Amino acid sequence: QVSSRGLGDVYKRQVKDEINITDKKAEPFIKQLNYHLDILSKFTDWMKEKIKNSPEDASGACNDYLKVLGLVATGHAWLKVLEVSFKEYDSNKDFYEDKIQTANFFFNRVLPRIESSYITATTGSNYIMNYKFN
């Protein structure tokens, strides 16, 4: 059984342990995912602290937290796709080139949204909870 204290670290370690692509072409993708895993880890620590001390802040951030978690998980899945794509590339170049291009789009256009979600969420809940409707 994993305590809630270490859950984010367990996931981060699992993802990093599974990233064992040796192809040099994968390095930019791995670097991107590691960077965003670190943001997820900071966000997880922030959420754990806010759940204890400021539940409204945690509530206000939960949607963004789930987005970040989902994007990191999708990046992890794309790395697995890339591992196969680089290995099998010569057997079906057109097919695997499409996979690599789609991964490139995801890692450069979609995954960076994590930063925005993290920054937005960690500003606190005042902008949500204290909004005055007219």
What is each PLM-predicted segment?
Residues 14-134:
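C-terminal amphipathic alpha-helical interaction region
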Residues 1-11:
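Single conserved hydrophobic/aromatic residue that forms the stacking wall/gate
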